[in-house]
């Protein structure tokens, strides 16, 4: 018989340097740190095997299928410059290994058991190339950037948001009041914090009602369309959908979901509901740093961002480059492009390992949030451009005169930066001067400038390119 029992080296089956990748393959770039004594070919082949058809020993049932058709293949290995014993292993997966339209299934295979594999000291998924054939099985973002602008009637500038603080402990009525003050002052959006769900001090239904009242009042007073990201995240999918339905009945424009803690299955269901019912969907990435912050193990955020674009969301938090949370500039701009653009060229200097064509899947607006204030406005406008949401939580609510003046200060600073940019001025070089000029005719901005003139979050990023 052709069956030969026993353990054989992975590389004999799964390391295929001569393989030419197909347009329909899902391609993955792994950063592999093998255990001492394990050659890189064996480590790369082990990753390909354990994340596709392989197991630790030859099995009789291998003969009942065509491994050549279904196996993952490690087709290229390169050492990581400046690191000893660390390699980038490229793996190609045949499309048939994955259920259509399921980010959950894709991740279960590609980043499943293999990450606990003993022959590896550490493993990190750096990037994925999603083939067009697979992308076409996903709905993607409920609406996308252009439709959102049309719904909100806001063009030619970044949008402004604010997370309501203190994040936990306010009653629904006081929470709604804070929302109203911010929106009336000139912000486009306010936001539930990611951990505001339905707690004893503020149940979700009360919050939804008071926030809806606040945004309609602010809308009437300012003549601008306003939104509040109502967090629909809940303990069960059914409860989450119930909250989304209630938000739709209130007629609000946007709801929110924590997509990593809530899970991709729940997120995809919610995104489908949002498209069917005209709701925008704001996505918060709570838990991402558990997965993506370590340089040699886990999964890079650009992979989580691609997965979100497939699963569906209209906004996603994407770091600030200048605030209090982790984020290297080139890397951040790399995945910001992956979220917004239709076609992204391979560019290793920005951490992009593969050329990605999104075949007209709608884009996602990146949200800059975390420790930013008016002095950061020129840098943020320059780094993120118009298609972004800039969120100032403490940077609005921490204003010495209150929420509405805090909102005014941010709006004045933003309009000044956009005007200066449109006149051809260099925001990077002249940013401080632009803010100072604007503060001369805005007492609210002048007060904000005074409060935050010394605040900096100067720490080196942990996850850098080199």
From Swiss-Prot:
Pfam families: RuBisCO_large, RuBisCO_large_N. GO terms for molecular function: magnesium ion binding; monooxygenase activity; ribulose-bisphosphate carboxylase activity. GO terms for cellular component: chloroplast. Signal peptide: none annotated. One of its GO terms (biological process) is reductive pentose-phosphate cycle. Belongs to the RuBisCO large chain family. Type I subfamily. Heterohexadecamer of 8 large chains and 8 small chains; disulfide-linked. The disulfide link is formed within the large subunit homodimers. The basic functional RuBisCO is composed of a large chain homodimer in a 'head-to-tail' conformation. In form I RuBisCO this homodimer is arranged in a barrel-like tetramer with the small subunits forming a tetrameric 'cap' on each end of the 'barrel'. This is Ribulose bisphosphate carboxylase large chain. It comes from Uncarina grandidieri. The gene is rbcL.
């Amino acid at each position: 018989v052709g069956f030969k029992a026993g353990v054989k080296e992975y590389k004999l089956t799964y390391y295929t340097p001569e393989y030419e990748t197909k347009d329909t393959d899902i391609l993955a770039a792994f950063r592999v740190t093998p255990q001492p004594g394990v050659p890189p070919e064996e480590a790369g082949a082990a990753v390909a095997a354990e994340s596709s058809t392989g197991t630790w020993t030859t099995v009789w049932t291998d003969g009942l299928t065509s491994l050549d058709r279904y196996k993952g293949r490690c087709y290229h290995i390169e050492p990581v410059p400046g690191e000893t014993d660390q390699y980038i292993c490229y793996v190609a997966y045949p499309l048939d290994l994955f259920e259509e339209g399921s980010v959950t299934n894709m991740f279960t295979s590609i980043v499943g058991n293999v990450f606990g594999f003993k022959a590896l000291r550490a493993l990190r998924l750096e990037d994925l190339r999603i083939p067009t054939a697979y992308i076409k099985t996903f709905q993607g973002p409920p609406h996308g950037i252009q439709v959102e602008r049309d719904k909100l009637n806001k063009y030619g500038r970044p949008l402004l948001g604010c997370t309501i603080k203190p994040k936990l402990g306010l009653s629904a009525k006081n929470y709604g009041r804070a929302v109203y003050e911010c929106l009336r002052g000139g912000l486009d959006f306010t936001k539930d914090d990611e951990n505001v769900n339905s707690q004893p001090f503020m149940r979700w239904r009360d919050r939804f009602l008071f926030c809806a009242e606040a945004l309609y009042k602010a809308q009437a007073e300012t003549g601008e369309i306003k939104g509040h990201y109502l967090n629909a995240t809940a303990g069960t999918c059914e409860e989450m959908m119930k909250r989304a339905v209630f938000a739709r009945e209130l007629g609000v424009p946007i709801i929110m979901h924590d997509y990593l803690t809530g899970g991709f299955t729940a997120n995809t269901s919610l995104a489908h509901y949002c498209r069917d019912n005209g709701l925008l969907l704001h996505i918060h990435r709570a838990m991402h740093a558990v997965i993506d912050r370590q340089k040699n193990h886990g999964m890079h955020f650009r992979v989580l961002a691609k997965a979100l674009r497939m699963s569906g969301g209209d906004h996603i938090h994407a770091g600030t480059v200048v605030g209090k949370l982790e984020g290297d500039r080139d890397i951040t701009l790399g995945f910001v492009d992956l979220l917004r653009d239709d076609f992204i060229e391979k560019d290793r200097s920005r951490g992009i390992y593969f050329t990605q064509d999104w075949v007209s899947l709608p884009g996602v607006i990146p949200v800059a949030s975390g420790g930013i204030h008016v002095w950061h406005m020129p840098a943020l406008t320059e780094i993120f451009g118009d298609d972004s949401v800039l969120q100032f939580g403490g940077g609005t609510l921490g204003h010495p005169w209150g929420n509405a003046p805090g909102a005014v200060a941010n709006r004045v600073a933003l309009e000044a930066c956009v005007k200066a940019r449109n006149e051809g001025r260099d925001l990077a070089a002249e940013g401080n001067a632009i803010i100072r000029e604007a503060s001369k005719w805005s007492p609210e901005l002048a007060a904000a400038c005074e409060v935050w003139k010394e605040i900096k979050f100067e720490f080196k990023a942990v996850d850098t390119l080199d």
